[in-house]
């Protein structure tokens, strides 16, 4: 490790506070009553319930989502036997990966005990605390005995990740690699370098899937493992000992091998050995940090080889984070008493299948220009693929149920998968009523920037989720090329329509109609013709106007107001309103907050603010949320008398006259809007109850500043919008920072709006 990396790692672990984990309360502890409920005397109630029924612990404590990462530090990743305390940073790191990727809480438990039986007693005694045990960095052969004994003694999952995590990922890679080169698992010959925990577990899993044991040859530090090589050979090694045919070295047995599985050390496999392997060999060089052979060296002599390593700087990384968070997620969610072979095999197949799916936008962003389409350079998913949790955890949970180890079976798997999706997409629960309604009657939605990669990823999701009938504006050749490059599985003419923005035969009709609509707004025939040819937002808007599309999304490129100046004059305002407005939603840990007007009106009048407020309340109801509106000002219930405060008071009068049932109050400070006790100190009889969820600002500056400050200050917050309100057709203008998920969300909202449009 170079000095710069070393110092960066030390600083990372020391600042701003030592270590990588902490315990955070999930209940409020702000009052004496809170303390009485959390501890004495109130805590006695759940204790007595658990005494009567131990399963009640899953209802009243955090046990159901708590895993122990346990180690004695005898085989710490690449560092060897450094002891339990020195291995603590690794165990903390494992804990944060559980939390990051699967939302599982972890206590790291470092046990200073080398005697396997004493270690087993310590861990077994912890069963009341945890719902799962992840054994970590325990040397072989003791790790086999420890895991076996704990599995027999404990009634919760015990999983040695160094064995089974590596085995699950490697097996998935081998299955997919063989599929690429068109070989059968039952026919191939495999040579293994290393006979430790990971290697043994890999072989066991492959044999369970159909690899023939007689086609496996294992080499350890002493050479080929053959029968009667030595007295008292470990059972795990003896199980794979071959007949003695005189071959003693890796070089002797590699000739003609289809697969090399390396779980040993650096530079074990040479180029000369690789040359002797069978057609299209599969090489898993998993030693870290330096593999048995570097991929460039293997490729120099065998360009037909498919290569996996444990490193992130080469394709096909075998990384245990692809597995352990999600296999535990599935196990915990059904109250599994073990992680059995059926569950491991389910994880193997789920991981293997995900590599065949279309490319995820999150993965594409993380890995730049890498080709992530299934093939020699991509036979296993990337660790940051957000779909891992929704593919692996349900497969594992179902396998647990089918194999009889689930104590809390899942009744509704669709609902379970949807809940897991909320972990990936924070807007999922918020958007649920919109998605459900959109699926009932998908509408034609034109996406004006159809060549954009985010739009193409969004189109894939829209098609997969059945939310809309997308129409992409762009050059067909560019769209097709990018779909192929991105590894998407959508087809023009089948899943979506393309409008060629360079040569669509309808363009003469488009610009003629655009001219007729805009000729009294300073647009000449020549300008109309040029606009249709050069501006994809104009094309999309004309399509909606002509009834060739039901709704439109634009704005992933360019300035908001450039798009607004196209759509508003063309469509006008909807019936009954004389202005438009924009609203953004912030999904914060404290609750959902909507802010208006963030994009349209610089300094709206009271009449305009009243219309914006009423439209915002209507939009919020679409999400299944009852609006609670606060009109914000630097004045707090009449504390100041100035034009902006008067404007908000007048707005309140106008809104109450038109919607007396709406829960609204103002003008008020921001803290009074969000904290009821602060508001009640000033205005005890305020009709606004609880925290306001719609914040109407006096002008665009206040709205935009507030929105952006809240957006960046909350690391856990996500956004939806901008929602354009008041325009006569379902159209939404996004911003250049819009993510794929935000595009999907806004298309779904546009579909729902189009469903309720008058014919």
Stretches with model-predicted labels:
Residues 237-306, 311-313:
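Rossmann-like adenosine-cofactor binding region
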Residues 85, 137-184, 407-410, 417-689, ...:
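Anion-binding alpha/beta catalytic cores of soluble intermediary-metabolism enzymes, centered on
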Residues 193, 209-237:
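NAD(P)-binding Rossmann-fold cofactor-contacting core
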Residues 157, 161-162, 181-184, 287-393, ...:
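Adenosine-phosphate binding glycine-rich loop
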Residues 127, 185, 253-254, 274-277, ...:
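A short, aliphatic-rich alpha-helical micro-motif
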